[in-house]
Structure formats: C-alpha cells, structure tokens
Amino acid sequence: MRINPTTSGPGVSTLEGKNLGRIAQIIGPVLDVAFPPGKMPNIYNAFVVKGRDTAGQQINVTCEVQQLLGNNRVRTVAMSATDGLMRGMEVIDTGAPLSVPVGGATLGRIFNVLGEPVDNLGPVDTRTTSPIHRSAPAFIQLDTRLSIFETGIKVVDLLAPYRRGGKIGLFGGAGVGKTVLIMELINNIAKAHGGVSVFGGVGERTREGNDLYMEMKESGVINEQNLAESKVALVYGQMNEPPGARMRVGLTALTMAEYFRDVNEQDVLLFIDNIFRFVQAGSEVSALLGRMPSAVGYQPTLSTEMGSLQERITSTKEGSITSIQAVYVPADDLTDPAPATTFAHLDATTVLSRGLAAKGIYPAVDPLDSTSTMLQPRIVGEEHYETAQRVKQTSQRYKELQDIIAILGLDELSEEDRLTVARARKIERFLSQPFFVAEVFTGSPGKYVGLAETIRGFQLILSGELDGLPEQAFYLVGNIDEATAKAINLEMRSNLKK
C-alpha cells in the first residue's frame, strides 16, 4: 500500500524521473513498446499512453507489461480499447504495478479495473492506494482454525456451511435467485459480523451489473444519501471490455477486500461473478501473447493464474476474506479444465435449483446437491452433523418416492413413507426464509436465524413433535416458534371462515 499525493489519479504518478518509451507495434489489445538501452521496466509495471488521435480526441490508455522481448522491447496488454493509438506515440512507465484506491472511500461506489469511478458521483479519495499484484499472506500470518461463517440463512448454515476465510462456488442458471442471495449475504455480514463486501463483476453482462446496482440501492445495501454507510464496493470489468481488463478486474476487487481485512481488521465477503470469465480472459491474453495453448485451448498457465488469485483469499490473524464465486460450467461439462481447476480451491458449493424456484421456495438452494467440507462432526459438532444428515436422508427419500406418488398417489404409500413425505414437505418449506433485501418486493420483514435456532427447528420437525401442524405454517418463516405461531393464526382464520 502507498500514500499518493492528492493530485495523482489511481496508479498514475507524475512525469518526473519517469521512463519514456515509444509504441513500436500494435496488434489489437497488445502493444509492443521500445525503450532506450538500460531502461527496461519490470514485469507487471503499468504504462500510460496519452495523446490525441487523428480526429483530435483525447487518448488515455493504461497497459500492463507481460513480456520482456529483448532488443529493448516489451510486450504489454491494454486495459481499455486501443482505438486511435499510433506507432511512435510516447509511453510513460509509471515504475510500479497498477494501483487502485482502497478503504472506506470505495464503499457505495462502482470502479473499473483501473480503480477509476464510473458511477458519475464525482472523484474518489486516492490518497491511499494499493498495488493489485502482491503475494499471498505468509504461512505464519494465516489463521488455520476451522470456524463456521454464520450467514443467518437456514439452508446454508445447516446443510452446506461456509468456512470463515473459505471459498464457495455458487451454481445456478438465470432467474433462480443468485442476485437476491448475494445481496442478502452482503446485508447479513454487515449486520452480524460488522463486515463489508466487495463485488467483482468479471466478464458478465453490463445490463446485469446495472440491475444489481439498482437493486442494491433499492434494498438499502448502497445508501445513496450517505455513501459511507454503504456495505459494498463494486468493481466491474464487463463482457465488452478488452481481455486485459477482464483478466485483472478480479485482482482489483481482491485488493480492495485485502485492505478491509489487513488494515481495518474486518471480515470481508468477496463476490466474483463469474470466475469462469477470469479464466476465459486469461486464455485470450495467452493466445494474444503467442503462448502454446494447453488442453481444450486453455492457457498453459491456467493453474498458476487461478492459484495466484485464490491463495490471496484467506483468513489471517487480522481478519478474513470469505469468497463466493459464481461458476459457469461450459456445456455442463464438469471435467472442462476451467471449472475443474476452480473446484480444487472450493470449500463448499451452493447449488440453486430451478425446480425449487418454480415452487416459490426461496432461497432456492438445493439441499441434496449443495455440499461443504465443513459438514463434519469434529468441526460442526455431533448435534449439527446428525440433524443435517437426517434432513438430507428425509429429503432424499421424498425425492425417491415422487415418481410413485405421481403415478399411484399418496394413498398407495406405506404409513412410514407417508409420514416421511409429510415431514419432508415441512422441511422443504422450513428451508425457505424471508430476506431483508426482499422486503421491498414481498412486504414480509426479513429474518436472521442463528445456527442454534436452525438446528432446534429441524430437530423438532424430525422428531414428529410438529406432525399436527399444516405445511403452510412452515413456509417463509424465521425460527420454529414463528412457524408454531403461524399455525395458530391459520387455524384461527379457518375457524372464523366457518
């Protein structure tokens, strides 16, 4: 981290004593730059090209050094469009890697890969910046205790708990509730853990990024009146941007998250949507730099690039970064090198089901497909583990019986199976929950449910103590006491109708 003079922009220093080179070749987003003998820059140094194109328009392009070619030339990748650049234009070596603003000034704002605000809300305080390239924390700094990161979301905490400082893969198609789940997690970490969140939009649609921003403002995650009270910083490098920007935007978001962890000593949530696009951008850059492709056309450095990003996401003695990464699986092929490399780093998977979303059960987290390495008796305790396993067994049995029910009907089942189905349907509905960020749409107040309350609720359903309550009483409630109260209300209403 460095303190810049107030006049400097993110990652761009003054001209005094700076290395100057000239553009020797332009091939799309790749620029070759020639320097005087003995003035070669370092790998990952940021370059700035300023000038005017033939139409007199101002040009300001930032590049990053990728290769030293010999003959006093370097090969760089541009972070923005190279339209209007010409051979012979002057290039300024900033003498340092790309640096971005960090700290409280970033909350409530949208940035590009360079750390420049793109939300038309004025300049950002750039006195404190940090380089996007840095080493992962040393072993001695790591906090290796296995601890659960409580989210207040019943289905997640019970069946696929998140690890503090862990990495979670979020799988789900369009329209099943990924955005709302992400916003609820951002809201809950701020309330329960006093933490903040950083959202990295890597290579996804601009429209989706805009929708997320608008929904965050509507739900109060971003406070327009007082940005300092916002709970999230947004960093976007969308589909239409050059591969260099899409490859580095994840590091920009991670750098902002690291400051909150290391300096502010907070628990941070880092969202990356989509981690596959990070790999895809790296593949494009690799091809542009002339490297020999590896399996299925991916870059030969795939594992190294993924590792350099993922190993920085961890818990230290100061704080933690817990990362939730949306994972696109090309052609649903889990053996594709991109998702396969990602899986090696994940501690948990949260799978969203279209079938549950169609039933109106939100969050639509699939209780059988979602997994976690934390769901072990020695980590979560015997009580939690046993309850989770019994919930999964009951749900699995219900799934197996659904074909029989569809063909023959519920009456053809044995007494034991009918009881299992009734409890499974209650469990399915009790796994739903009203969200704080959805209050503006549903009119129902959101609920944060502690882990102990969650376990108690499911134990009561499994024990049969609540067999007499109607299924509807368990739908969109917080803890089990609310379900009991709802059942009494439903009974009173039905009596009044009679």
From Swiss-Prot:
Keywords: ATP synthesis, ATP-binding, CF(1), Chloroplast, Hydrogen ion transport, Ion transport, Membrane, Nucleotide-binding, Plastid, Thylakoid, Translocase, Transport. The gene is atpB. It comes from Saruma henryi (Upright wild ginger). F-type ATPases have 2 components, CF(1) - the catalytic core - and CF(0) - the membrane proton channel. CF(1) has five subunits: alpha(3), beta(3), gamma(1), delta(1), epsilon(1). CF(0) has four main subunits: a(1), b(1), b'(1) and c(9-12). ATP binds at residues 172-179. It comes from the Eukaryota. SMART domains: AAA (SM00382). It is found in: Plastid, Chloroplast thylakoid membrane. The keyword Transmembrane helix does not apply. GO terms for molecular function: ATP binding; ATP hydrolysis activity; proton-transporting ATP synthase activity, rotational mechanism. GO terms for biological process: proton motive force-driven mitochondrial ATP synthesis. Belongs to the ATPase alpha/beta chains family. It is a peripheral membrane protein. It catalyses: ATP + H2O + 4 H(+)(in) = ADP + phosphate + 5 H(+)(out). Its EC number is 7.1.2.2. This is ATP synthase subunit beta, chloroplastic. GO terms for cellular component: chloroplast thylakoid membrane; mitochondrion; proton-transporting ATP synthase complex. Produces ATP from ADP in the presence of a proton gradient across the membrane. The catalytic sites are hosted primarily by the beta subunits.
